[in-house]
């Protein structure tokens, strides 16, 4: 397997009409999601060269996930630019990243222009409307190798300057294969994504979903302040697996959200990123 795009291609062939990724506004089947990513990739081809960085300055939603894969179709690697960071910190990151282009959206375009005055910008809405150039995409993918970079995440910059950590396709493939085999994920899995996309932990949700032909629901952030509604969301979406920070799990217990409603489909509960309090 040369890159993680093979996960998407394979699942789109197996489950074209199945829900792939959803947020609180939109939902994409595998066929729709694959087409969208190919359109984004086609739109990026004239703006980039293979193995260049592309910044992603978007809200946390299903379209952002599509942007990640569209960037891969263009042979590039992505870096999520946290929209809540101060402008100075984002400019530091952009200076280090040196992206060929930054993908944003019409709603954030004025803000992006102010923060990244010297970086080329393109709106996702523009890319999504492009015709798919199947021949050009195939040409780029024919030259792809598994050690190509997939994404770069930047540290918090506690030493004064954010540092980028570059991760290859092979690293994500190896981890995803182990993750899915160890915990026996399959196409019946329904993930509820909690972690932000600028954290490595989100990689598990995204790529396990695409690898298995499963479904990933991006949980609205507001629900993590409304534990009873969060539990209801888990039932409404028939979530089978969560991999959250302990503070999110503890909130459900501490506010006695389970007294009113219990998760009915949940089978796998995992935690990451924080120590689980002993009393829990």
State where each predicted segment sits.
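Short, Asp-centered acidic motifs that coordinate Mg2+ and/or phosphate
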Residues: 100-101, 190, 240-241, 268
């Amino acid at each position: 397997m040369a890159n993680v795009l093979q996960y998407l291609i394979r699942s789109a062939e197996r489950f074209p009409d199945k829900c792939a990724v959803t947020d609180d506004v939109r939902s994409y089947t595998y066929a729709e999601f694959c087409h969208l990513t190919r359109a984004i990739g086609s739109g990026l081809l004239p703006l980039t060269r293979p193995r260049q960085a592309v910044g992603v300055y978007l809200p946390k939603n299903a379209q952002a996930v599509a942007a990640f894969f569209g960037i891969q179709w263009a042979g590039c690697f992505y870096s999520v630019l946290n929209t809540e960071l101060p402008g100075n910190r984002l400019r530091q990151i952009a200076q280090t990243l040196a992206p060929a282009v930054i993908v944003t959206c019409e709603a954030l375009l004025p803000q992006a222009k102010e923060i990244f005055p010297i970086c080329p910008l393109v709106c996702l809405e523009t890319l999504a409307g492009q015709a798919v150039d199947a021949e050009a995409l195939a040409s780029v993918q024919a030259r792809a190798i598994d050690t190509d970079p997939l994404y770069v995440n930047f540290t918090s910059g506690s030493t004064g300057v954010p540092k980028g950590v570059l991760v290859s396709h092979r690293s994500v493939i190896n981890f995803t294969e182990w993750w899915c085999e160890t915990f026996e994920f399959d196409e019946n899995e329904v993930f509820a994504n909690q972690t932000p996309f600028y954290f490595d932990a989100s990689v598990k949700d995204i790529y396990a979903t695409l690898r298995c032909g499963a479904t990933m629901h991006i949980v609205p952030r507001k629900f993590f302040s409304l534990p009873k509604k969060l539990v209801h969301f888990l039932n409404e979406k028939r979530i089978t697996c969560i991999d959250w920070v302990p503070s999110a799990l503890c909130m459900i217990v501490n506010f006695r959200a389970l007294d009113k409603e219990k998760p009915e489909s949940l089978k796998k509960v995992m935690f990451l990123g924080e120590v689980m309090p002993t009393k829990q």
